[in-house]
Amino acid sequence: MSYQQQQCKQPCQPPPVCPPPQCPEPCPPPKCPEPCPPPKCTEPCPPPKCPEPCPPPKCPEPCPPPKCPEPCPPPKCTEPCPPPSYQQKCPSVQPSPPCQQKCPPKNK
């Protein structure tokens, strides 16, 4: 017999199972001394600052003048204009007698 066999005279036993730790009582919920006050701003928020005012919109180039597809044709009359008709004939002008006396007769 070896030395180890002489020492063990009874069969080996598993180690004892440790019981779970027991708390004396459940933990109480944490107590706040008082409710938290609302956050206080030191000053009102400043208005947002834009880096610079917006530039006016830029067109790529000025609009070209409108182009007609072709020049307009001259207006066409549907019928020729009639010759002007005089309503009455002008009477022949005769110098009055006093006028004839003032003017010398023309030499032809």
From Swiss-Prot:
The keyword Phosphoprotein does not apply. Keywords: Cytoplasm, Keratinization, Repeat. The keyword Cytoplasm applies. Its main location: cytoplasm. Cross-linked envelope protein of keratinocytes. It is a keratinocyte protein that first appears in the cell cytosol, but ultimately becomes cross-linked to membrane proteins by transglutaminase. All that results in the formation of an insoluble envelope beneath the plasma membrane. Belongs to the cornifin (SPRR) family. This is Small proline-rich protein 2H.
